Amino acid sequence: MKTHLLLWGVLAIFVKAVLVTGDDEATILADNKCMCTRVTSRIIPSTEDPNEDIVERNIRIVVPLNNRENISDPTSPLRRNFVYHLSDVCKKCDPVEVELEDQVVTATQSNICNEDDGVPETCYMYDRNKCYTTMVPLRYHGETKMVQAALTPDSCYPD
């Protein structure tokens, strides 16, 4: 009897795995690691009208607990407010080469890119490709000096 139940359990897991891998792939619209967000989109059949398809958007936000107001300063107070603007999360300002009528053109994927705004993006998590440092006191031979320490050593020091 236990073997019979075990086989049914394995079969249920296998069927679930097949159904999950058979799902339509979602298109990633934005994956902002700095703000811990991901926006995906996929086309699914409408439940109301079988002749129509609708766009389903999924917005995943991971709220990092115990993060600091200033992620580069370990002594700053804990962050209590997290503000997300969908237009900022989905903004893609990196230039992309697009072919238009046998001509390659460089364009951005967003029309709200403004190089002159000067306001840095608020990061709720370390961007692993960016080097973050802070000044820390170091005591050596009875003398205390302020030295710069890497908060993300992998991105600050090449192999």
Curated annotation (Swiss-Prot):
Q: What does this protein do?
A: Serves to link two monomer units of either IgM or IgA. In the case of IgM, the J chain-joined dimer is a nucleating unit for the IgM pentamer, and in the case of IgA it induces dimers and/or larger polymers. It also helps to bind these immunoglobulins to secretory component.
Which gene does this sequence derive from? Jchain
Query: What is the first-listed, main subcellular location in coarse terms?
Result: secreted
Q: What is one process in the GO biological process aspect for this record?
A: humoral immune response
Q: Which UniProt keywords apply?
A: Disulfide bond, Glycoprotein, Secreted, Signal
Q: Molecular function terms in GO for this entry? A: antigen binding; IgA binding; immunoglobulin receptor binding; peptidoglycan binding; phosphatidylcholine binding; protein homodimerization activity; protein-macromolecule adaptor activity; single-stranded DNA binding
Where it sits in the cell: the answer is: Secreted
Q: Which cysteines are joined by disulfide bonds?
A: C34-C123, C93-C113, C131-C156
Q: What is this protein called?
A: Immunoglobulin J chain
Q: Name one GO cellular component term.
A: dimeric IgA immunoglobulin complex
Carbohydrate-modified residues: N70
Subunit details: Part of the secretory IgA (sIgA) complex that consists of two, four or five IgA monomers, and two additional non-Ig polypeptides, namely the JCHAIN and the secretory component (the proteolytic product of PIGR). Part of the secretory IgM (sIgM) complex that consist of five IgM monomers, and two additional non-Ig polypeptides, namely the JCHAIN and the secretory component (the proteolytic product of PIGR). JCHAIN-containing IgM interacts (via CH4 domain) with FCRM (via Ig-like domain).
Using the record, list the residue span of the signal peptide; answer none if the entry has no such feature.
1-21
